[in-house]
């Protein structure tokens, strides 16, 4: 009783009771969304070289921000794949101008995507529905560039073109002679003994032609 009285007395050592040793620890709520390892890798792969902010996106961002970053990362990865395929192919000189313009457009679009992803990850900036839709519309226009590059890449695959040309040349060289079409003989033109005399006869008057005929008969 004495010890209890000492705890509650105004002259005691513990004015409001003896303190306990327990400390307050903050409880963090678990996020309602779950991110798969594949999504995490795609986001990290879609970021600019030397930048790794995927953990920031997954750590303290909302589900909406995570979905936006994932969609942007997928588009960035597609652009990177197309650029890598074009760097690996030899482009004819006649197509250099067109290809360089397409590559510049894709790189500019990828820079916009990178900036948007970094803003989402490192700051409290979140794209609004209208702004994100505008970015997706711009991206849809750039998909036409991807289709053009796909057609051009298919057309200028150098290895296949070289093999095809070599096969055609071999077929032409090794073609048998009997397969060649036979030459059609030309019809010979009529040969006249004295075309000048015939022409002069045609130009004579009818009376003169009769006299010439009579003289020829007398000679015979």
UniProtKB/Swiss-Prot annotation:
A lipid is attached at residue 11 (S-palmitoyl cysteine). GO terms for cellular component: host cell Golgi apparatus; viral tegument. The keyword RNA-binding does not apply. InterPro entries: Herpes_U44 (IPR007619). The keyword Protein biosynthesis does not apply. Disulfide bonds: none annotated. Pfam families: Herpes_U44. Its main location: virion. Phosphorylated. It is found in: Virion tegument; Host cytoplasm; Host Golgi apparatus. Keywords: Host cytoplasm, Host Golgi apparatus, Lipoprotein, Palmitate, Phosphoprotein, Virion, Virion tegument. Plays several roles during the time course of infection, including egress of virus particles from the perinuclear space and secondary envelopment of cytoplasmic capsids that bud into specific trans-Golgi network (TGN)-derived membranes. Oligomerizes. Interacts with UL7 homolog; this interaction mediates UL7 homolog incorporation to virions. Belongs to the herpesviridae UL51 family. This is Tegument protein UL51 homolog. It comes from Alcelaphine herpesvirus 1 (strain C500) (AlHV-1). The lineage of its organism: Viruses, Duplodnaviria, Heunggongvirae, Peploviricota, Herviviricetes. The gene is 55.
